[in-house]
Curated annotation (Swiss-Prot):
Transmembrane segments: none
Its job: DNA ligase that catalyzes the formation of phosphodiester linkages between 5'-phosphoryl and 3'-hydroxyl groups in double-stranded DNA using NAD as a coenzyme and as the energy source for the reaction. It is essential for DNA replication and repair of damaged DNA.
Residues in coiled coil: none
Binding residues annotated for NAD(+), in chain numbering: D47, S48, D49, Y50, D51, S96, L97, E122, R145, E182, K300, K324
Gene Ontology molecular function terms on file: DNA binding; DNA ligase (NAD+) activity; metal ion binding
Catalytic site positions: K124 (n6-amp-lysine intermediate)
Binding residue positions for Zn(2+): C418, C421, C436, C442
InterPro entries reported for this sequence: BRCT_dom (IPR001357), BRCT_dom_sf (IPR036420), DisA/LigA_HHH (IPR041663), DNA_ligase (IPR001679), DNA_ligase_CS (IPR033136), DNAligase_adenylation (IPR013839), DNAligase_N (IPR013840), Hlx-hairpin-Hlx_DNA-bd_motif (IPR003583)
CC terms in the record's Gene Ontology section: cytosol
Cofactor(s) the protein needs: Mg(2+); Mn(2+)
Protein name: DNA ligase
Catalytically driven reaction(s): NAD(+) + (deoxyribonucleotide)n-3'-hydroxyl + 5'-phospho-(deoxyribonucleotide)m = (deoxyribonucleotide)n+m + AMP + beta-nicotinamide D-nucleotide
C-alpha cells in the first residue's frame, strides 16, 4: 500500500477486527519504512508521509489501546541491524527526537515547560548518526545507530575521517566517554564524488546523506579514507562517573569542541521564544547557502538539571525537539505518464518529467500515486506541474498549473489491460487501487514477487539481489520461486557480469536458505497483507505448514494480528491451485521448513495467567522472541505498568516502566533470574 491508500481507508467505520488488522498493517508498514530509512538508507516514502502515518498510528492506538501492536515503531527507534559488520550493544540507547512542522507546534513545545528557559539551537544535519566510544581519552570503537539498542561496529571506517579525534585534547580525560554526532558529506564534495563514481563505476549516489552512509558501510577502509567525510558532534551518550558534566547544553558543546570535535558554526543560544523565531527565520533563508545539507533545526533546553527533571519517553528526550523543514518544491513539465506493476499487481502511475534539479538531485520521474489522485489534481500529459521531493524518495507531483495548460494536453486514463502482460486490470472494492489480474503470468509481478521471496526477512538469499533477479527472469531462467533452487553454475556464469566466484556465492547462498523457519516461509510466499508480525503469529498458532494450509476463516480471525481482511486473503491464497502447486514444488525439491519449537511445558507456574511487562534490552533474548516465549507458557504480555501488572521483566537500560513498577511494588525480575524461572 501507499501512504495515500492508508489515508483513503475510512478506518473510523471499520469493525473491530478490521480496525485491528488495519492498525497492525499500518504498524508493519511503518516498521518496513523505518528499516528502509535507518538501516538500508533507501527510503521509498517522504519524511512528511512517514510522520503523518506515524501520527495516525499514535492516534488510533491512543483511542484503541487494546489494539496496540507489540514491538512496533511506537516503541522503537529506527530499523534493524544490517548483517555484515559486528554488532555492538549501545551502553546508552540511541534515541531520536520528536518532530514538529510549524512554528505553532514549536511554540507549544516551549509553552509546555513551565519555566522561563533558554534553548540551545542548532542545524539538524542530514547524515548518518554515529556513536564514538573513548576509553581514557583514546578512540576505542564507533557504532552506527542501528535499532537504537545495538548497531554496526564501523571503527576502522570512522577512524579514517580526518576531523574525528583519535585522542581527546585534554590532560584529564574521563575513563569512559561516548560522543555522538552526524557523519556528513558537504555539497561540493558530494558533486565531486559523484563525478568520480560516474566516470569510474557508472553509478552515482542519490544525495549526500546516502553517500555518507554508504561510505561508512564499505568493507574497505582504504576506499573510505579517500572520501572527504566529516563528523559534526551534537552531544554525548554514556559517560563514566569521573566525567564532570557541564551545567548547560551550550557549555557541553564548547567542551566537546575543546576536546577536538567539530561542532556546527550555526549554533545559537536563544534566551526566549522571540529569539527562537529569529533563529528559525535566519536558518530557513540561509539553508540553501550552507555548505552541507540540513533537513531541519534542533532545539534543546539549555539547563542540564532541567533536562534531567523533564526526562525521556520511550522514543527519546522530552527536553528537545526537531523542527522539520517543508519539502522542496520546483516546477517541471509532464512529458508522459506510464503505469508500473507491483508485487501484488497494484498499478501505479508514474510521471516522466522534464529533468529538473530538486534538493541537489536531478529528478525525471515522480509518483502520481493512483488514478484518483491524477483526476483530483487534474494532471495531464503536457502540463506544467509542481514537483516535491523530501529526502531520498521518489518525488511526487503536488499539483498542476492549469493556467499554463496547452490545448493539446492529454487527459490521463487508467488502461484496461496490464501494460506488461496484457491481462485485464480490475478495480478493487471501488477504492483507488487497480490491479493486474495476471498474477504469476505477469512478468512484472513475477519479478517483484521473486525479489520479495529472496529478501532478508523472507528466505534471506542475500547474494541474490534485485538486479540479478531481473536478469534471471528476463533470461527465462526462473519464473516461480522453486526455480531458484534449480539454478546451476553454468546458467549463472552465462549471465552478464557474473564471474565464477560470484556465481558460486549465489549458489552457496541459495543452499544456505533451504531450511527456513515456518514464519519466514509464510512471509516469503507473499500472501497479500501478510507482514512479519502476522507471519510469526500464524506460525506460532498453527505450528506446521500442513495445519496452516487447512486454516479456516473462523479460526484465522481469532488469531492475534489477523483480521477479516487478512483471513480472507489467506483462504483465497490456498484456494488458488497455482499457489498450491508452487508450495508443493518447494517441498518436492527438498526445502525443509522448520516448525516452531514447542515449549516442553505448555504452562509454567511462574507465568501462567500472569500479566507481564518487558522493559529494557536483553543479552540472551530479542524482545519479540521473549514476548512470544512468555505468551507460549501462558503469560499475558502488556506494554504498560499498572496495578494489574504481576511482574516486570527488566533488562539493561530500563526506563520509566522500572521506576513505576518499583513505585507500585510490582515484582521485578532481572535477566539473570529469568532463565531459572523459565
Amino acid at each position: 500500500m501507499t501512504p495515500n491508500e492508508f489515508f483513503s481507508i475510512k478506518y473510523h467505520i471499520l469493525a473491530k477486527a478490521e480496525l485491528k488488522a488495519y492498525i497492525d498493517k499500518l504498524a508493519d508498514y511503518l516498521s518496513q519504512q523505518s528499516y528502509l530509512y535507518h538501516t538500508l538508507d533507501k527510503p521509498i516514502i517522504s519524511d512528511s508521509d512517514y510522520d503523518k502515518l506515524f501520527r495516525l498510528l499514535q492516534d488510533l492506538v491512543n483511542d484503541n489501546p487494546q489494539f496496540k501492536p507489540i514491538n512496533s515503531v511506537l516503541d522503537r527507534v529506527g530499523g534493524e541491524v544490517l548483517a555484515g559488520f559486528e554488532t555492538i550493544k549501545h551502553k546508552k540507547k540511541m534515541t531520536s527526537l520528536a518532530n514538529v512542522f510549524s512554528l505553532e507546534e514549536l511554540r507549544d513545545f516551549y509553552d509546555k515547560i513551565e519555566y522561563d528557559i533558554e534553548l540551545e539551537c542548532e542545524p539538524k544535519m542530514d547524515g548518518l548518526a554515529i556513536s564514538i566510544f573513548y576509553k581514557n581519552g583514546k578512540f576505542d570503537y564507533a557504532v552506527t545507530r542501528g535499532d537504537g539498542i545495538q548497531g554496526e561496529k564501523v571503527s576502522e571506517n570512522v577512524k579514517t575521517i580526518r576531523n574525528v579525534p583519535l585522542k581527546l585534547n585534554t590532560s584529564n580525560p574521563p575513563e569512559e566517554l561516548e560522543v555522538r554526532g552526524e557523519i556528513i558529506l558537504d555539497k561540493q564534495s558530494f558533486l565531486s564524488l559523484n563525478e568520480y563514481m560516474q566516470t569510474h563505476e557508472n553509478k552515482t549516489f542519490a544525495n549526500p546523506r546516502n553517500a555518507a552512509a554508504g561510505s561508512i558501510r564499505m568493507l574497505d577502509s582504504k576506499v573510505v579514507a579517500k572520501r572527504p567525510l566529516k563528523l559534526y558532534s551534537y552531544g554525548i551518550g554514556y559517560f563514566s562517573k569521573d566525567f564532570v558534566y557541564p551545567e548547560t547544553q551550550f557549555e557541553l558543546m564548547q567542551l566537546l569542541q575543546s576536546f577536538g570535535f567539530t561542532i556546527s558554526d550555526n549554533m545559537f543560544l536563544a534566551k526566549n521564544f522571540s529569539e527562537v523565531e529569529e533563529y528559525h527565520h535566519k536558518m530557513s533563508h540561509q539553508r540553501a547557502d550552507l555548505a552541507y545539507d540540513i533537513d531541519g533545526l534542533v532545539f534543546k533546553i539549555n539547563n542540564i538539571k532541567l533536562q534531567d527533571t523533564i526526562g525521556y519517553t520511550a522514543r527519546g528526550p522530552k527536553w528537545a525537539i526537531a523542527y522539520k523543514f517543508p519539502a522542496e518544491e520546483v516546477e517541471s513539465e509532464v512529458l508522459n505518464v506510464e503505469f508500473q506493476v507491483g508485487r501484488t499487481g497494484a498499478i501505479t502511475p508514474v510521471a516522466r518529467l522534464k529533468p529538473v534539479a530538486v534538493g541537489g538531485v536531478i529528478v525525471s520521474n515522480a509518483t502520481l500515486h493512483n488514478i484518483n489522485e491524477i483526476k483530483r489534481k487534474d494532471i495531464r500529459v503536457g502540463d506544467r506541474v509542481i514537483v516535491r521531493r523530501a529526502g531520498d524518495v521518489i518525488p511526487e507531483v503536488v499539483k498542476s498549473l492549469p493556467q499554463y495548460r496547452k490545448s493539446d494536453a492529454q487527459i490521463v486514463e487508467m488502461p484496461t489491460n496490464c501494460p506488461v502482460c496484457d491481462s485485464k486490470i480490475e478495480n478493487v472494492n471501488d477504492q483507488a487501487i487497480y490491479r493486474c489480474t495476471g498474477g504469476w503470468h505477469c512478468q512484472a509481478q513475477t519479478t517483484e514477487r521473486l525479489k520479495h521471496f529472496v529478501s532478508r526477512k523472507a528466505m534471506d538469499i542475500d547474494k541474490l539481489g534485485a538486479k540479478l533477479i531481473e536478469q534471471l527472469v528476463a533470461a527465462n531462467l526462473i519464473k516461480y520461486p522453486a526455480d531458484i533452487y534449480k539454478l546451476n553454475f553454468e546458467q549463472l556464469t552465462g549471465l552478464e557480469r557474473m564471474a565464477a566466484k560470484s556465481s558460486q556465492n549465489v549458489l552457496d547462498s541459495i543452499t544456505k536458505s533451504k531450511e527456513p523457519s515456518l514464519a519466514r516461509f509464510i512471509f516469503a510466499i507473499g500472501i497479500k497483507d501478510i507482514g512479519e508480525v502476522s507471519s510469526d503469529a500464524l506460525a506460532n498458532h498453527f505450528g506446521s505448514l500442513e495445519s496452516f494450509r487447512d486454516a479456516k476463516f473462523e479460526e484465522l480471525i481469532e488469531i492475534n494480528y489477523i483480521g477479516e481482511i487478512i483471513a480472507n486473503n489467506i483462504v483465497s491464497f490456498w484456494h488458488d491451485s497455482l499457489n498450491i502447486k508452487i508450495v508443493e514444488e518447494f517441498l518436492a525439491i527438498g526445502i525443509k521448513i522448520q516448525n516452531p519449537v514447542k515449549v516442553e511445558h505448555a504452562y509454567n507456574e511462574s507465568f501462567t495467567g500472569k500479566t507481564v511487562v518487558i522493559t529494557g534490552s536483553f543479552e540472551n533474548y530479542g524482545r519479540t522472541e521473549l514476548t512470544q516465549l512468555l505468551k507460549s507458557i501462558g503469560a499475558k504480555v502488556t506494554s504498560s505498568v499498572s496495578k494489574k501488572t504481576d511482574m516486570v521483566i527488566c533488562g539493561d537500560n530500563a526506563g520509566s516502566k522500572l521506576t513505576k513498577a518499583q513505585e507500585l511494588g510490582v515484582e521485578v525480575i532481572l535477566e539473570d533470574n529469568l532463565k531459572d524461572l523459565l
